[in-house]
Amino acid sequence: MEEERNSDEKENALCGRSLTAASRDGGGRMPAAPLAQGKVERGKVYSGDGVLGYLEMLEAQAHELGLKQEEKEQQEKKLDRLKARVQELRARRDELRAKVELQEKRLLDKEGVMTDPAQPSAQTVLEWKVKSLKAMLQVFYLTGISGKLTKQGVCFCISTAYEGTYLDSYYVDLLIKPLVKIQRHSVPVFIPLEQIAKKYLQTDIRRFLSVLSDHLNAYVGRRRQADQLEEHFSDHIDGTLQRNSLCNLLVFNYTVSSNSKTFPFNVRLLYGDLCCSLPTEAIISCTPGTLPLLAEMAAAHSNAFRHMALHKAFDSLINAKESQN
């Protein structure tokens, strides 16, 4: 019994040494699987501060950048769609203008060959005028001119503005049968409406409205500038600003200080172009016999008044004067 037990112990010892040897590689090293498993386990324990945490941060940043890139691409696509829509509207506008011009030409040609009084030429002309006016209303919608058809013609509304500020609206009620003529209007008497109508109303209504709109917008622009000057710079002006109804002639006085002396200047602004809100001539005079520097200053002021809005030009002159003082 004792011999059998000793034999079993020797056999088990030999098996243990064989397993130990088999578990080692050729250099006597233990396999890497348990060590690798230990690293993974340690990585799981310290993932918040280790490599996995860094990878999670990179993944979050990549996701955020992806969202921003997607948003940018969507904005670019939206901008491209808006640009395409603008081009489409412009093309539609040009198409309507071309149709109106073609209809006008056809009507003139048709009236030239009509000799039979039995033909319903008056009705044909009236129908054409109504169609032309409808197309014209669509063309003018984005230019500050709107209108609506009436039983006898069309009533136009011309809206005016200056520097993005809406000011006044004026109305022109036109009759289109048998000839185009003005029935009623709210245009100021000093606007040359009769001359404009005589020149364009019978041959080109679109041109008539465009020129009239230019006159009205230029007038309210000049008036707005004069109002701004009186409102914001009254303490720099001597006396009152003088102007006529059309505001195409403005006269006022202001003073300039130099070397403890005060020199008065007189300004006379003439607006030769009634379709423009800037003067064509700016005459500035100062006391005779004053310093040559004042003459140079007057020339600089004249140039500013001719190239800038009145209140903006005066503001720049006042600021320049205060800087010099």
From Swiss-Prot:
Transmembrane segments: none
Record-linked InterPro entries: CENP-O
Pfam families xrefs: CENP-O (PF09496)
One BP annotation, GO: centromere complex assembly
Disruption phenotype: Increases time to progress through G2/M phase.
SS bond partners: none
Stretch list, region Disordered: 1-35
UniProt entry tagged with the keyword Magnesium: no
Coiled-coil blocks: 55-112
Principal subcellular localization: nucleus
Keyword Coiled coil: yes
UniProt keywords, alphabetically: Centromere, Chromosome, Coiled coil, Nucleus
Cellular-component GO terms for this entry: Mis6-Sim4 complex; nucleus
Localization per Swiss-Prot or TrEMBL: Nucleus; Chromosome, Centromere
Subunit structure: Component of the CENPA-HI complex, at least composed of CENPH, CENPI, CENPK, CENPL, CENPM, CENPO and CENPP. Component of a discrete complex composed of at least CENPO, CENPP, CENPQ, CENPR and CENPU.
Family per record: Belongs to the CENP-O/MCM21 family.
UniProt function note: Component of the CENPA-HI complex, a centromeric complex involved in assembly of kinetochore proteins, mitotic progression and chromosome segregation. Involved in kinetochore assembly and required for recovery from spindle damage.
Protein name, entry field: Centromere protein O
Name of encoding gene: CENPO
